[in-house]
Amino acid sequence: MKTALFLVFALAFIAVEGKFSKACSKPGQTVLAPDGCNHCRCSKNGIIMGCTKKMCPPRTMKQSCKPGATFKHKDGCNTCKCSDDGKSARCTARLCW
């Protein structure tokens, strides 16, 4: 069980590291996370050490949607559902790899 948990965390770290590898050009640099509101810190060797995990404020929609309809978020991995009035949507907040 401990080995399985270690592997999960190691794979998650590698995936996050790969997603941000171009963003960390300077040690100690802080970069914007893919969600657009959290921040990640770069280690001395230019690898992401960790990111904040705060709740992000809802984003405003630039267009309306069909009430009750579901659609893919622009990140390609989260799913959104349109509100009953078609003026807002709620999306899942999974970390995308």
Curated annotation (Swiss-Prot):
InterPro entries: Pacifastin_dom, Pacifastin_dom_sf. Disulfide bonds join C24-C42, C37-C56, C40-C51, C65-C82, C77-C96, C80-C91. The keyword Metal-binding does not apply. Residues 1-18 form the signal peptide. GO terms for molecular function: serine-type endopeptidase inhibitor activity. One of its GO terms (cellular component) is extracellular region. The record marks K53, K54 as: Reactive bond. Expressed by the venom gland. Keywords: Disulfide bond, Protease inhibitor, Repeat, Secreted, Serine protease inhibitor, Signal. The keyword Phosphoprotein does not apply. Residues 22-59, 62-97 form the Pacifastin domain. PROSITE patterns: PACIFASTIN. It is found in: Secreted. Residues 57-59 are annotated as: Pro-Pro-Arg motif necessary for proteolytic processing. Inhibits trypsin activity and prophenoloxidase (PPO) activation, an enzyme essential for both clotting and insect innate immune responses. It does not inhibit activity of chymotrypsin and protease K, and has no effect on phenoloxidase (PO) activity. Belongs to the protease inhibitor I19 family. This is U-reduvitoxin-Pr10a. It comes from Platymeris rhadamanthus.
